[in-house]
Amino acid sequence: DQAVPFFEAWKKHIETIGFKTLSLRRTGSTDHVVFNGLGLPAYQFIQDELEYGRTYHTVMDTYERLSLEDLKVDAVIAAWIALSAAMDEGRIPTKPGLPAAPATR
């Protein structure tokens, strides 16, 4: 993927808080897919799976099971990636197969 060099450069600054792995592996449909369909490059951030196999999107998927520490780290990583993308002199290439321009209604 042409975006890998961007993410590799950006993650160097935040590896110590937990951003260590970059993967091109597809994991199925997630929230970012809608943005891709509109022609916007969007990427999926995956954290350790923890109890996903038993609780994710079930009645067991409740607020009490949230890890506040993980949410804080995720927020820092997402903010850093957004800031890095905004400040980078380059432009992240659009993913292959995406529309060249966002869809209009």
What is the role of each PLM region?
Residues 47, 52-105:
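His/Asp/Glu-rich mid-to-C-terminal helical/loop segments that flank catalytic regions of hydrolases
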Residues 1-55:
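Metal-dependent peptidase/peptidase-like ectodomains
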